[in-house]
Every structure is written in structure tokens, then in C-alpha cells.
Amino acid sequence: MSQETYELKAEARERVGKGSARELRRNGLIPAVIYGDKQAPIAIAINTNEVTKRIHAGGFMTTVATIEVDGKKHKVLPKDYQLDPVRDFTLHVDFLRVSGNTQVTVEIPVHFINEAKSPGLKVGGVLNIVRHEVEVHCPADAIPEFFNIDLSGKKIGDSIHISEVTLPKSVTPVIDRDFTIATIVAPAGGVDESAAEAEGEAEA
């Protein structure tokens, strides 16, 4: 499951546009919008520090939140945010309204485990990561936090495909082909022969 949900307080904003957005930012607020679920969009302002903390904590785009706007609570999933390219602060956030049966498309990070059990890595092979994240369809209330990719037994030349990853029943990849997530390749200087021999003897 994704990270534990959290709550943010916001205020509805009547004025929109660049001038209004600049004024909000000067006052420590970020302009944002809540949309979707067949309801009218709501322009809101949220606390800059609270949102920045959530973004930097990780999992921001895959964690469902509750935003309270003038006493009414909205269950949402962040869909996009804009950062200032120079000063690296948040300029705007888009939130999608969700309910328990809402299907969402999210990018889930992959974690590699059991590196020490990979013969290819033991002899100096390099893990070449093709995809750091996998885009999937899933219910809003069942977003995985990450996918574990097991490297046990993987040798130089081996590839890890999405078909080797155990996905929850309600989660399906956006791409329907059996795409590659990572490969184990020989190092630029070649394989350490003594290490390879030792590994071969250990397997014998």
C-alpha cells in the first residue's frame, strides 16, 4: 500500500491569474486546484511549507490526501506540480478528486533487493536500470508504495522484465508488452576472472 494518508487545510480563492498567484506566494501560500469526479473545479490556496515538506518526503504523487476547504473535506491524489526552475520552490499543484473505486494512473518506484545473491553483480557486473518507475493503473485506495525487484540468481546478460514482478491483483501496467526494467551487464573493464572463478566454485 502507499504511504499513510495525510490532511491539509486550504482556503478557496476567488481571484485567479498571475497577479493573484504572486500575491499568494508572497504570503506563504501556493495556488492549487481540485478537479475531477464529475464536479466543478475549485481554486484553492495551501500552505507552502506543508506542501513542500510532503513533496520532499517522497511518495507525494502516489499518496491519497484529504484537503479541507472551508470546512468541506475532499479526498484527492496529487496529479501534477510545478517548480520554479531557478529557486526550486513549488509554484502550483493540481489535485484529482478520488473515491474508493476511482481508477488512477500512477508511476510506482522500483526497489532492487538481494543484490548480494546475484552472481552477475558478485563478479563485478553492473545493474543497468532501464526503468526507475513503472506506470500502472490501479484503484485510488490501493496504490502500491513500491515494487520489489528480486536480483537473486541473476547473471551477467540477464534481464528483468515486468512479467517477473508480482503485482497486486488490482494493479496492471499501462504498457501491455513485457518490457525490461533492468539488465545486468559486464563492466567496462571486463569481468574479474578470479571473482568469477570463485563464484563458479561456490555454485558447484
From Swiss-Prot:
Listed GO biological process terms: translation
* Functional description taken from the UniProt entry: This is one of the proteins that binds to the 5S RNA in the ribosome where it forms part of the central protuberance.
| Any one Gene Ontology molecular-function term assigned to this protein's record | 5S rRNA binding
Subunit structure of this chain's protein: Part of the 50S ribosomal subunit; part of the 5S rRNA/L5/L18/L25 subcomplex. Contacts the 5S rRNA. Binds to the 5S rRNA independently of L5 and L18.
Provide GO CC annotations from the record: cytosolic large ribosomal subunit
> Could you tell me what this protein is called?
Large ribosomal subunit protein bL25
- Tell me which InterPro entries the record gives: Rbsml_bL25/Gln-tRNA_synth_N, Ribosomal_bL25/Gln-tRNA_synth, Ribosomal_bL25_b-dom, Ribosomal_bL25_C, Ribosomal_bL25_long, Ribosomal_L25_dom, Ribosomal_uL5_bac-type
In terms of superkingdom, the source organism counts as: Bacteria
Q: Which PANTHER family match?
A: RIBOSOMAL PROTEIN L25/GLN-TRNA SYNTHETASE, ANTI-CODON-BINDING DOMAIN-CONTAINING PROTEIN, RIBOSOMAL PROTEIN L25_GLN-TRNA SYNTHETASE, ANTI-CODON-BINDING DOMAIN-CONTAINING PROTEIN
Keyword field:
Ribonucleoprotein, Ribosomal protein, RNA-binding, rRNA-binding
Q: Which family does it belong to?
A: Belongs to the bacterial ribosomal protein bL25 family. CTC subfamily.
